Amino acid sequence: MMNMIQRVAANRHGRDFVVGDIHGWYEPLMAELEAVCFDPALDRLFSVGDLINRGPDSERCLLLTEEPWFFAVRGNHEQILFNWLRQPDGVDVEMWLRYGGKTWLGTGPEHYFLRHPQVRRQAETLAERMPWVIELELEDGRRIGISHSTFPLDEWEDLVLRLPFEPALQEALLWERPIKQPGFVRHVDGIDLTVHGHVVVPRVERRGNGIYIDTGAALFGKPLKRSSRTHNPRITAIEVGELFLIPATPAPSPLAFD
């Protein structure tokens, strides 16, 4: 059975950052890392998933998982890819292409992977080892839980026990959008903070002990007439210690991009 929860020890030599959804935007990610003076020899980057689709460099973003300083949970966009690799007939390819896959897959995944077998091999490896959840230890003993869309339970240890055996719980970690509910707040016991992406927010938000960090890579190149609140979509990377300083956020209506 694959290890669905990856536990990562504290970084004793450098800094740790978390980053929101990347969606194939490699160059904006590199610009953000340069802005925070990221040092790949010492620092580490933890991703909430959705590395691929929509942007022009999905391959380069997917291959970041080969770097020793890069850690990522799977997002719903990776899971669509993994589902196709496992059972092509079980995936609506036209929907996938409309959902942002066309930017790198062209007319479809079958032809693309025939031309790029090395990317297919990397994706097949990730399908077997990419976790649903990362548990990150800090030097002071605090712990941060990272998953793509949310943490759907009230107790951290419940997830540890149930995740391998409950497909519905696995789906919830990839697809649920509770932050879109007015007034949503959840405090997860047994973990100090949780960090998520999936739903675009105009700025990093805290609900209970959950941090939502997807500030809009999905919006790059899109007209923003749907909302005047997100006038500056970006990829956001935050040092983990700073997450604890983010105040609780009143519950606005996040944007309908994921």
Labelled PLM ranges:
Residues D21, D50, T65, G75-N76, ...:
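Divalent metal-coordination and catalytic microenvironments
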Residues A172-A248:
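Conserved beta-sheet core of the metallophosphoesterase superfamily
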Residues M1-L62:
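N-terminal active-site segment of His-dependent metallophosphoesterases
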Residues H116-R203:
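His/acidic metal-ligating clusters that form di-metal
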Residues V18, L45-S47, A72-V73, G145, ...:
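Residue-level marker for buried hydrophobic side chains located in beta-strands
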Residues S58-E135, D140-R142, Q170-E176:
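Active-site neighborhood of divalent metal-dependent phosphoester bond hydrolases
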Residues R15-H23, R143-T150, Y212-I213:
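Active-site-proximal beta-strand elements of phosphoester/diester hydrolases
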Residues H23-E27, N53-P56, Q79-F82, P152-D154, ...:
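Active-site environment of divalent metal-dependent phosphoester hydrolases
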